[in-house]
Structure formats: structure tokens, C-alpha cells
């Protein structure tokens, strides 16, 4: 790799700037394009967009390798020569310039016109600068290691932040409010002028385009773009004169022109560049291969200024109609012999795939809004097909009856998702023998569209064919297309076909998906019979209809579809396939279980299955049954068990639960089963605890009896000794030494305290799992109900239905009889949904829960979310594509009145009481876009090499360099803002942390947080997970204030997304307690533990082992600050609980009992000391003497003690031990 990454110096002579020269370094194996990227981001050259690079006077191509220019030299000398503009270059310059001067905001991406994104706000978190590496050394004593090395100022701000956390009462509106935009335009507007197109007369004078700018001073500039540059012309709003304005000059760039005509432009641009420079670029750069997260709770409506640039640019688009399939397949065929070639290939693939996804999304929305003409306009709407920009669109439904016996449209819906999942796998496989189509699934208002790049030639007509009919007359008919099915099921002939030549191209496909050869209708196949193999006009082999290459979940299908005769109770479809992750998990387990070699098992096709088994009558395969049983009997129960035990982190929200299930290969239809198993686990744990408590009670009773008998036994021994001694004395004999010594007891008879573990119920883990699984079931059931009612509605009426339905669900306590609110233009159509009642809606939701998840919702389930409506609103909005405006919503009249009274009197008189909780003006509907994306193999390989080396100390530096290079590769191919980039930063931060590189770990984790917020959302589980990591890293890096800020954010988000206490909240308070301890702030520790105790009570109740443990920690703290009575109350509470939970003869209980005696003695001693001190003070006052107060000194010493020292002191130890003695005692 080192040879490939050798660098050279690049010196570029430019016609601008003071030095007239720019320098950079570049890899020899990079292309000239990388130098052009440098020029595009360099401050001195970025405003020049139209140039060519010369080497030795000859123009170089951007795809040329730098090594070809450098030869054996270490420096490459290039010249930048400006070119005359043409219209296309002027438009490119105009678009690029708009981006540079703030017209493209932080929340803008390629589909901003379809949905809103919030401005990210993680960068606004008032985190202090990353602390430098700590100066702690290994020889520091234990206490120094535990203490933070922070200033008094940071201690103060931490304490203040802690107090705000303890009083935290966040609202969804505050938590999810977006940030402030970093990028703000430096002009009021910059648009293409209405005087375009350029008249023919002026076109011959070199005019290319007319622009119009309004400066911040309010001056309107009409600009002419010519082949030589830009100048301000004489036009006005009412007069067209594109000639050069008096005293104006031609400028090479718009930047140069506007700087001359607007002082505020220059100053605001400097401020913008300074603001951007102050932040990592991931906070504001536009993503190039993914979409930004489209929030369910946008902070504001889009602030549209007069700017119709997007429409104008589409009209002025000089590109020919793109053929995405040709581009995609051509790039896949390019060589990838070295790293540079592979990177270039992956970069181009990412760009083509993303451009297709953007075009497919926008095209689908044109269809939903009725702006695209169908190819078959006379057919019913569901049968309409569309073709635009070489993308084929069709509504997802069972048009040809293929799924008639499997559930019809419901099965077709499921198959479209399954098809996309197969394509995701194919994208990663880099398979070239057989091709797939670019695919996107776009859903809007419950209607789903499948967008695909068509097989070349499949939509072309073969012209007309003339034949003679029965009467002998010539008749024209459509000639058959040459593109026909040559492998798989051919609907035209109703036969299964297997062309041998095409079949040979499917070997790699069969290996990737672990498919075995099988026969269907006497024809041997390598893939599912429903898949279709065709050869396009481009002579490439294509495989279509991929879904059925995943095996059937036969156990589920037999039980919930085949065996159910009542269609209303039957699962909606039989397209219940197993996920790819499950198949891979099973396959790896089989390879490991049999001791097979991984590569050999793959190449030989071991552990493969028949994809047609149980889908076609008479075709069976035990492997498919094994796969289904593996999911149902092993994977699902194991997952529930692991969550219950805490070996898997409790999911942060519904999306996290779904992600955990999917990564384990579990389909969402098993949510009901997850709840069933979790409830069983909870009952089992409760039963185990109850049995344990009964056993402890019996043991306590038995021990008490033994103790009483043993005491009697000792008393009898003492009496016997006394009788013997008296007898000896009476006889005048000497008493033997053994009778003078302490009574010797038989150790075998003494019952020493035991240390058996108590039994606690994992309520925190299981309650979260149960709650989130139920929320997912409810929200998904609501999605299906909404989909049913919206299916035939016009797009503009969908918000009316949504507002009405949400009022029925959530606004019932505010308005029990909401009325559907239509747009201002009104509607003469009587829509059926307007007659829907709350009872009917709740009934439909419950029916869907039973139908799709085999789960019966508990009676009154809706009332559970009356106090936490946003916990359910959020997943509903995310799943159906609803965007609710971030504002105050009133779910009861009382809420509204309280809010109204809190407003200023002047405002209060103008307020209009809302008719219902939700209005159509509060929401919009966005498309749900499902796409397949590519991950970079070059980056993965580089990371794998680093992972192989990282555990070898002498290779750690190389490993870290490889990790960084991997991220750089990923950024180059996917862009700086991408989920996989964030994942890499998060993983690398963990690695740095383990290597004690704490500052670097914090920086990397902050970067991950910034990216995750933009692509996944502020309330996403990825963001919460990253913040949790960041909190731990900041804490380890001696930055308690920063850690507290992160924990506060986590708790705020969790309060919105989940209606029960999450283990992460408990963990957050535990971390705060630990930080307070390191800061030696006992009073703060007490506050945190009291808060933690309240949470434990909510989860486990007062009579629980966790509560007892927390109380014991409080007792220690109260004792350390001299509040002995409070300490005693806590200890007595602990003793009672430990006695019941652990037993009276448990070591902890015994220590607790002795502790009670010690504290009681301490209280009595303190009381006596006070009385003695008071009498001495009175006597001293008479004599005019003053002596230091012994108690104050003792209390101060006690406060400085550790918990172990306190225990020793309370249990009978003398004066406070010195630090040197602490270690000695600890060793004992």
C-alpha cells in the first residue's frame, strides 16, 4: 500500500492572487481530478470554475493519472488557464457560486423540495474545548487516580449543570427544536433573470445568460453573463438593456463583480467563511450519496424567498436525457486493478445510484400529484405505468394475479421490499456475470410506487406487423419484442425455461444466496422459478423479480396462513420470507458447527436450500424447515433472553428495536412473539424471586431458631464453667489456665455469614422491551389503517384525513367530536372517512395488531399514552411520512388554559382557541423512500487490515493509520456526511479510547455525533448511542461538564421517545454520581442518589434489592457529611430489605446490623460530646478562655474519609486513619 500512496508535490501557476502560484500534494496513483477538487475548495481559487489545466503547454484530462505527468520527478508543474464561458459553464458557475455564498443551507439536500429537515444543533451544545491528555501517572495513589484534574470554574459549571439535570422537565418542543442555520445568504437574492432567453441579436454579441441580484443594501443588479465574464447592465424591472452599464467593468467571476458593488456582501461573506471555518465541515456540507434525515417534527415552515432557480435550472438543463442503467452497468464493467481504480469505480457507482434515487423520488412525487402522463392513460389508475428520464414507474399491486393465492396486493407490497433487500446484497457482491436493475420504492400517503431502470430494449417496440385476417383483409398488429424471458417462469408461454448459456451466468448468484439446484416442472434451475432471466439489447444478462430467492418461513406460513380458513383472521399474505441476515446467521452457525472451512463451504455450495420449497405445491426441502425452526425456536427466544439479561443493550426507541431484530434476522411480524416471550421471561423472573424470598424467609426463621438455641448452648457452657470454677475455689484449688481463657467454641458449629447472591427482576430491561414492542405494533397497525383509508384519496386530501384521525386518537380529551378540516378551496366530494368514529378507529387498529402481529392489544391501551402522546405520535409520523410542525399542541382543555394564562396579557386577548388538537395547517406528508446503497469495499479492506494489526503493540501506529485511511476512502466515495462514515468514526473513537488516546477519542466521537444527527435524526438511536459513548469519553478525559451536557441530552431525548424509565437514564445518573465522587462533592452525590432512588422506586418499588443497595450508598454519604440520623434511617431501611432479600445471616445484612449499632453509638457519642463541649464552653466563657472545638475537627476528618475508612471507624475503629494507613487497611 505504501507504494500506491507515494505522494508528489503539485505546483500550479494561476492568473490570479499575489503569488500567482498554488501548491498541494497528491498521490501518484490519484487522478488529475483530485487536483481539481483541491482548487474547488481552496480559498484563492474556488470562485474560478471555468478553466483547463496544462502540463508542458498541453491540456490534461481530469481522468489522467498524476504518475503519468510526474514521471520520475518529485514535483508536477501545472498551469491553470481560464477558458471562455459557454451557457452551460455560466450555469455551473452560477450554481456553484450560490452554494459558496450561503444559498444552500445546512438542512438542504437533493430532495429538500419533497420534505423538510431540521438544522442540526449538536454543534450548538456548549461543549468546552477538548481537554489535553491528562498528566496523571501510574504512580499516583488511588485517590488521585479517582479525582478529576479540573479547575474550580469547571467544578462550578458542572454543579450548575447537575442542578439543571435534577430539575429536568423537558418538552418535546424544546428537545426536538432545530438549531440555527450556519449558512445564511450574503445576498437578498440571486436568480436567473426573467429577461431570458437571450435574444438572437445579443447572442451574437457573446451574451449567454442574464442574472439578477439584490444586495443586502437593497440595490437590484441586472447582470449579463458573456463569454468573457460578467458585468452589470442597464436593465431595470421595466426596461431591458443588457449593454454594459456606465462605469461598470467586466469581471471574471460573480464574486469579483458583487464584491465591487456591495460592501455588505464582502463583509457578510467573510463572516460566513469564518463561521464555517469554526466548525467541522460535517456540520454543514451537503451530502452527496444519501439524504438528510427528514424529521417528523420540523421546527419551522420553509422560508421561501422569491427564488425559482430550481425550475429555471431544470428548464435550462443542457444534459441529454440520462440513461441510468447504461451508466450503472458501464461503471460496473470498469477495471478495478488497484486502489485508485477501485475508489474511482465506487465513487462513480455511488453517484449514479444516488442520482437515480433522487430522480426516482422526484418522479414518483410527480405521479402522486398527477403531473406525469401515464403510458396507458385509459387503464385504471392502479394499472398505470410511467416512463420518464429512462426510469420506469408502476404502482405496487398484484396486477397480473401472480400473488392471487398468496394475499394479492399485500403480498405484492411485501415482495417489493424483499426485492430491494436482495438488490442491497447484490450491490455489495460486485457480481458481474448477471446484472440487476437500479430500484427504489417510494410510498406516499399509503400508495407505493416501484421505480426501476428498465432492461435495455424491453420497452422498445418492434414496430407493426401486417397479417391477413379471416376475411382476407390485412390487419396491423404489434410485433413481438425480441427481449423475452430465457430463464425462469415465462408468463407468455406459461412455462419454466432454463437456457443453458444464461444458466452458467447464475453460478455466482447461487453461491451468494446459498441456493441449491432443483427441478421445477422437469426443468433444472439454479434460482427461484419466479425470477426471470433476460438478455437486454446491450447483450448483458439481467435477473428480475428477485424476492423469492429468500426461503419461505414455512412454519409461520403453515400456522398463520395455510391453517387459517377464516380470511379475516388469516395473516394478510403468504409472502412470509426469511430475511437475508437470518440465512447468513444460520449458514455461519452450520459451518462453525461442522468444523468446515468457510471458503470451501462457500465454493462447494454447502448448506444450501431450495428457494421454491413450499412455495410450489409438491416441492419440499428439510433445510427450509430447519431455517424456519432456527428462527422461531432459537433466534427469537435467544434475543429476548439476551435483552432481559442485559447482554444486549435495551433498545433506545422503536427503530433501535427493529434494527436489533433485523440484524439478528428476525422479521417484524414476530413482534407479538417477542412480547409473549418477554412476558414469559418477566413472569419466570418474578416467580424465581418469589421462590427466593420464600426460601430466604424460611432460612431466616431457621437461622433465628438456631441462633436462639446456640445462644442457650453458650449460656449453658458458661454456667458449667462458672460451676466448675466455684467448686474449685470452694475446694481451695487453683483454677486451671484453660478456664481463665475465653470460651473456645467449635468452628464447625458456628454459622458464618454467607455471600449468596440475591435475586432481582430485570424490570428495567424487560419493561423497555415490552413497551417499545407494543409501540411498534400499535404504530405499524395505525400505519396500515391509515394506508387503507388514504389509498384512494387525492394527494391534497390526505392531510385532511391525517389531522382528523390524529384528533380522534390523541385529541379526544380536547374535542370529543372533531370535524374533518378541508383545504380552503373546499370539496364537494363526500369522503367516507369523515364518518369514522373513535371507537371504529381503535377497533381497526386492534384488528390489524392481531392480524399482522398475532398480538391482542390490552383494553384501554390508548389511555397509556394520554400523558406521553409524543412517544406514540413520533413512530406513527415516521412510519407514515407525517411531518408535524414543532409547536404547542393541547391534548386537554386544561393544557390550553394553563398555556393561555402563561402568555402575556396583550397576547392573551388576541389568542383564538383551537377547534381541535391538530389542524391541516400543522402538518404535511412526505414520501417514504426506500433505496439500496453501496458500501465501499476498499474502505472495508483497509479497516480489516488495521483490525488485524491493532492488537500487536509494535504495529498499532500502522493500524491507526490504516483506520484513518479507511475513513478517508469512505469519505471520498460516499461523502463526508454518510451513516457508514459516522459508524467508522465511532468505532475508531472506541479504539483510541482503549489505547488511552482520550483526546483523540473525544474528537472522533464528536464528529460521529454531528454526522448521525444530520443523517439519522437528533432523536435517533444512533445519536443516543453516540452521545452515550461521548459522555463516557468526556468523563474519562476529565471533562465532567461536557459529560453532563451529553447525559442531559440523552435523558431529554429518552423522555420524548419512550414513556418508561430506560436503563440508560439509570446509567446516566450513575455516571453523574461517579463524577460527583471524583469531584469530592458529597452534597451533589446525595442529590443524585436521591433522584436515582426515585427512579428505582418507579421501576422496582421500595421493597427491592436495587433500592436497598441505593439506600446503603446514601447511608455512607450521609455519614460522611455528619448527618448521622439520616444515615441511620437509611441503614435501618437497608437492614430490613437486606434481611428479606438476602437473609439475616448474609454478610451484607450482618455488616448492616453492626453498622446500625455503630452509628447509634456514634450519635450517642456525638450527643455527649456536644453536651461536654457546651459545658466546657460555658466554663471557658466564665474564665475568658477559648478552646478549639473537638467536634468540628472530628467532623472535618470524617468528611475526608473513604467509605471503607468510615465503616472501620463506625465499627469500632479509633481516630481517622491517615492516608498511609488507608492502604494498609485496604490490604487487610
Curated annotation (Swiss-Prot):
It holds the Pfam family eIF3_p135. One of its GO terms (cellular component) is cytoplasm. Keywords: Coiled coil, Cytoplasm, Repeat, TPR repeat. Residues 671-702 form a coiled coil. TPR repeats lie at residues 486-519, 982-1015, 1108-1141. GO terms for biological process: intracellular distribution of mitochondria; mitochondrion organization. One of its GO terms (molecular function) is mRNA binding. Residues 298-557 form the Clu domain. It is found in: Cytoplasm. Transmembrane segments: none annotated. Gene3D superfamilies: Hypothetical protein (hspc210) (3.30.2280.10), Tetratricopeptide repeat domain (1.25.40.10). It comes from the Eukaryota. InterPro entries: CLU-central, CLU_dom, CLU_N, CLU_prot, GSKIP_dom_sf, TPR-like_helical_dom_sf. mRNA-binding protein involved in proper cytoplasmic distribution of mitochondria. Belongs to the CLU family. May associate with the eukaryotic translation initiation factor 3 (eIF-3) complex. This is Clustered mitochondria protein homolog. It comes from Eremothecium gossypii (strain ATCC 10895 / CBS 109.51 / FGSC 9923 / NRRL Y-1056) (Yeast). The lineage of its organism: Eukaryota, Fungi, Dikarya, Ascomycota, Saccharomycotina.
